[in-house]
Amino acid sequence: MAAVWREGDDLLLRLYIQPKASRDSIVGLHGEELKVAITAPPIDGKANAHLSKYLAKLCKVAKGSVVIEKGELGRHKQVRILQPSQIPAEITALIE
């Protein structure tokens, strides 16, 4: 299964999250998932909120347009970005 794919106008990402990183970044592929490092700790939903904000900024959409579909409580997540205005080059290269 692909790490990144389109479904209509939406972008879907299978992610592996690394919380408490030194900076926010898209690291690259981690098995069949896209590894994303974020600075927020995995406490009380802070990492999920920070991930949504980071992906919204990258794709130039509102935070509400980033939906965590699976993996709310784990490092492995599936995220849907509704009608992204922009897709970063690191993600575009992986779209199938």
Curated annotation (Swiss-Prot):
<dbReference type="InterPro" id="IPR003746">
    <property type="entry name" value="DUF167"/>
</dbReference>
<dbReference type="Pfam" id="PF02594">
    <property type="entry name" value="DUF167"/>
</dbReference>
<protein>
    <recommendedName>
        <fullName>UPF0235 protein VC0395_A0010/VC395_0502</fullName>
    </recommendedName>
</protein>
<dbReference type="GO" id="GO:0005737">
    <property type="term" value="C:cytoplasm"/>
</dbReference>
<dbReference type="InterPro" id="IPR036591">
    <property type="entry name" value="YggU-like_sf"/>
</dbReference>
<comment type="similarity">
    <text>Belongs to the UPF0235 family.</text>
</comment>
